[in-house]
Amino acid sequence: MKDPKVTMSKFLSLVLRHQPQTIGVTLDRHGWIEIDTLIAAASAHGRKLTHELLLELVETSDKQRFAVSDDGLRVRANQGHSIHGIDLELTPQVPPETLFHGTIAAVLPAIRREGLLKQARHHVHLSASIETAERVGARRGKPVILIVAARAMHEAGIEFYRSANGVWLVDAVPPEYLRENSE
């Protein structure tokens, strides 16, 4: 049997990152939605979401995908949106010397040619640790870890952002700033 919390977390990711229209709601331009509105819409679509469960998912998610507003009235996804026009109000940050990206071998030829592209998302997601990048890459198969020369990119004028859950975000990573982890 599937864990109901995992199922609800995936449902929230769908609604808050990609398809709010599946339950007839819209997000504001910063990705927020009133918690009461979300709960009512989820309930109307057969989902048993309560205020307590939502807060538990926000607080206990190992990936910290979601955030509650300071006033406790709204919720949003921290990053990963494919919805156009969402502005997470991120400010540029100075990245560490290196960051990491987990992927699979099948896409390496394209990455070597084009670099890392954001595809349908707003940003390319990078990790501060190899372990996190391995977990991300392993979702699609045997992971290949790419090392990103983040500080060199920053010094070349490329802006980096850091989401509320510590994921580093950038518009793209040109191939000259990438190398494969040989370990």
Regions found by a protein language model. Give the residues of each.
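Eukaryotic, polar/proline-rich low-complexity intrinsically disordered regions
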Residues: 1-183
